[in-house]
Design a protein with these regions (language model features):
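Structural signal for conserved beta-strand scaffold positions within catalytic alpha/beta enzyme cores
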Residues: 87, 133-135, 224, 354, ...
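N-terminal "arm"/small-domain region of PLP-dependent enzymes with the aminotransferase-like
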Residues: 1-67
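Conserved C-terminal alpha-helix-loop-beta "cap" of PLP-dependent enzymes
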Residues: 294-469
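Conserved N-terminal alpha-helix of the aminotransferase class I/II PLP-enzyme fold
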Residues: 49-94
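Active-site-proximal structural scaffolding
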Residues: 8, 215, 230, 263-266, ...
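Charge-dense polyanion-binding interfaces
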Residues: 466-484
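Short glycine-rich or small-residue beta-strand-to-loop segments that form or flank ligand, phosphate
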Residues: 59, 86-88, 166-169, 327, ...
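Conserved PLP-enzyme active-site core in the AAT-like
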Residues: 11-16, 20, 64, 82, ...
Length: 484
């Protein structure tokens, strides 16, 4: 391998060489650098379609990288302080599932918080592993799930010494972090791997002012969404591995589910964004921290809103807080987070990341400007003035501890029947129900449907949350396990 530094972007450089070669394409894709689809070329631009190409010798192959993709992955591993990095083009969903499928199989136990992304539970459906849930605590005012308490994780390890792995969110969607170093040390002492969903933590590697990143904490694997806070294209992700993992086997697992037609647009975006973070990441992340701190102060000065931050830290369930997260509690305005989300989009042309029952998340990252923050703050102030309601009628919980009856795979593939949702109390759910975003299941296969959950679903629907998962997309019916 030639000498490479973080100033290089091997995939981008190879694509530039390919363009200069002026190859005549008798391969796929069929648009032939855009000539075969002028409408697409007009919409996306010739520069984009010029590099929407298939694998070839000079561009390497993601399924078996031996040249420029291998070099780009090496540079990414170096930038993120990992032993190896796998470029992923199926989103961090693919990275999370690869972590789990590489570590556990049918009947194996994996310790995890219940407030995981649906991709983690989907992986359990695929492999048949048994989740040992550590239910996170609830922040009483905000109603959101906290991190896993270290003692609770340790207790789960003691009860299930045969567990193969521990799965951790770092951070959660709301910015909350568990004590990842302590959990990792305890897990390794018990012979368990540590897998980290770091979808919302790419930026943690480029600041000393933020919570500890997974690789720095000694985790065995971490899935990072470069497209969320790293600046790459949507659907691009990186799977980081320590030298404790069998890399050849992990690569085989990835190739079971990942496409054989990897997009070079996505791969190049990962490569270029890694270079940008490696060279300018600390400066950029410092600027983001400052922008969010300013926004937090301004929003809290409006009244009724609560943009929360490091004051939540308790050294345990909230061991640390990601201060780039602009999470805003809206209940005191009498408006659900999803209502503020909708008003911002429909009346003010401001698109935030998500709104749920009582919280709103404005995702601030590498592309944001001070004037955008000012516009958001002004809109929130006007919404409070024009839309404020009696807050006493709002629901208070974002997270409900589930009653787990059987493992997700058994429930998902079991004989099932479809019932009107109002008739499902006490039955065992055989599918997912979730608000998306954030994609954390309200119900997962194998869990009992309770009054509290049904109330939450009805309220979320009424307030306009996008509920996904069930076969019946109208959410009038649910699939439940057939009673015997």
């Amino acid at each position: 391998m030639p000498y490479l530094s973080q100033t290089n972007a091997p995939i981008e450089e190879a694509l530039v060489r390919m363009k200069r070669a002026r190859l005549v394409p008798f391969d796929v894709p069929g648009h032939k650098r855009g000539r075969g689809n002028p409408e697409l070329a007009a919409f996306l631009g010739a520069a984009c379609l010029d590099v929407d190409v298939n694998s070839m010798k000079m561009l390497d192959n993601l399924c078996h990288p031996v040249s420029v993709i291998r070099d780009a992955e090496h540079l990414a591993a170096e930038a993120f302080r990992a032993a190896h990095a796998f470029f992923m083009v199926s989103g961090t969903t693919g990275s999370v599932q690869a972590m789990i499928l590489s570590t556990v199989g049918r009947g194996d136990k994996i310790i995890m918080p219940r407030n995981v992304h649906r991709s983690a539970i989907n992986a359990l459906i695929l492999c048949g592993a048994v989740p040992i849930y550590v239910n996170p605590g609830i922040e009483d005012t905000l109603g959101i799930a906290l991190g896993m308490r270290t003692d609770d994780v340790a207790a789960a390890m003691e009860r299930h010494p045969d567990a193969k792995a521990v799965f951790v969110n770092n951070p959660t969607y709301y910015g909350i972090c568990s004590d990842l170093r302590a959990i990792t040390e305890k897990a390794h002492a018990c012979g368990m791997k540590v897998l980290v969903d770091e979808a919302h933590g790419t930026h943690l590697y480029f600041s000393d002012r933020l919570p500890t990143a997974a690789m720095d904490a000694g985790a065995d694997m971490a899935a990072i969404s470069m497209h969320k806070s790293g600046g790459s294209l949507t659907q691009s992700s990186i799977l980081l591995c320590a030298d404790t993992m069998p890399l050849g086997y992990v690569h085989q697992i990835i190739n079971i589910t990942q496409t054989t037609s990897a997009s070079y647009l996505l791969l190049a975006s990962l490569d270029i964004s890694r270079r940008n973070l490696a060279l300018r990441g600390r400066e950029v992340i410092d600027r983001i921290i400052g922008l969010v701190a300013y926004a937090r102060d301004e929003i809290n000065a409006i009244g009724d809103y609560y943009a929360y931050g490091r004051e939540l830290i308790d050294g345990d369930a909230v061991y640390d807080f990601d201060t780039t997260k602009l999470s805003i509690f809206t209940r005191a305005t009498g408006l659900a987070g999803i209502e503020v989300y909708d008003i911002l989009r429909d009346d003010y042309d401001i698109q935030t990341e998500f709104g749920d029952i009582a919280n709103l998340l404005a995702y601030v990252s590498v592309g944001d400007r001070p004037k955008d923050i000012e516009r958001l703050v002004a809109a929130l102030a006007e919404i409070r003035r024009n839309y404020r309601k009696d807050p006493s009628k709002t629901l208070k919980m974002e997270y409900i501890d589930p009653v787990v009856v059987c493992v997700p795979q058994d429930a998902f593939y079991a004989e099932k029947e479809s019932l009107p949702i109002q008739e499902t109390k006490g039955r065992i759910c055989a599918e997912f129900v979730m608000c998306y975003p954030p994609g954390i299941p309200i119900l997962a296969p194998g869990e009992e449907i309770t009054d509290e959950i049904l109330t939450y679903i009805r309220y979320a629907k009424k307030k306009g949350c996008q509920i996904t998962g069930p076969e019946d997309m109208s959410i009038q019916r649910l699939n439940v396990m057939t009673e015997r």
